[in-house]
Amino acid sequence: MRIWAVLASFLVFFYIPQSYAGVALGATRVIYPEGQKQVQLAVTNNDDKSSYLIQSWIENAEGKKDARFVITPPLFSMQGKKENTLRIIDATNGQMPEDRESLFWVNVKAIPAMDKAKTGENYLQFAIVSRIKLLYRPQGLVIPPEQAPGKLEFTRENGGLTLFNPTPYYLTVTDLKAGNKSLENTMVPPQGKVTVNIPGGYTGGDITYKTINDYGALTEQVKGVVK
């Protein structure tokens, strides 16, 4: 592999959901079914003039590096207009919860190659980290994932709206509205709850929302009732 020296006075890191400039990931989330030996994630450099050093790693739900999943190759160089495949391998040894999904994060850092014309100069270097969900999904969960969005429950608590998720799946909730009031997007863990603020002036009315499915697409709008 070609070795790059990144020589700059400043190296700045940014976290973004999926892609930066010419470097893009092939999905917005990765589902890892229990029992599968590995899953794959495509990485593409769409920029024909730029090369990147790609570094990848897995973090747990708290944002700490986690060895329960192995990602390979962890480091490689990528020329313009090329595609590579990251392999994610289960190293959990059967030690994951069997009644719900578990959340991890896939991180892919793209470091642009140094411009040889600027060798010895001080300039700003941007390294971008794309970060997407990795959801480990056990077999035999009580309901299929397609039914989970309609199971959300809503209650008013301390001036906010509490979302309770009784399902075994992580639910990413978007386009959430209370009456005509738009609320913040959120992610509700399995068997867990999250509270979001309700803007002043809400006097009741239907709750409507969408969720994001396994393919990164929005589901149809769902109506909920505040209990």
UniProtKB/Swiss-Prot annotation:
Signal peptide region: 1-21
Any one Gene Ontology cellular component term annotated for this protein: outer membrane-bounded periplasmic space
Role description: Involved in the biogenesis of the F1C fimbriae.
Keywords annotated in UniProt: Chaperone, Fimbrium biogenesis, Immunoglobulin domain, Periplasm, Signal
Matches recorded under Gene3D superfamilies: Immunoglobulins (2.60.40.10)
InterPro entries recorded: Ig-like_fold (IPR013783), PapD-like_sf (IPR008962), Periplasmic_pilus_chap (IPR050643), Pili_assmbl_chap_C_dom_sf (IPR036316), Pili_assmbl_chaperone_bac (IPR001829), Pili_assmbl_chaperone_C (IPR016148), Pili_assmbl_chaperone_CS (IPR018046), Pili_assmbl_chaperone_N (IPR016147)
Full protein name: Chaperone protein FocC
A GO BP annotation: chaperone-mediated protein folding
Originating organism: Escherichia coli
Protein family (similarity comment): Belongs to the periplasmic pilus chaperone family.
Intracellular or extracellular location(s): Periplasm
Domain of life: Bacteria
A matching Pfam family: PapD_C
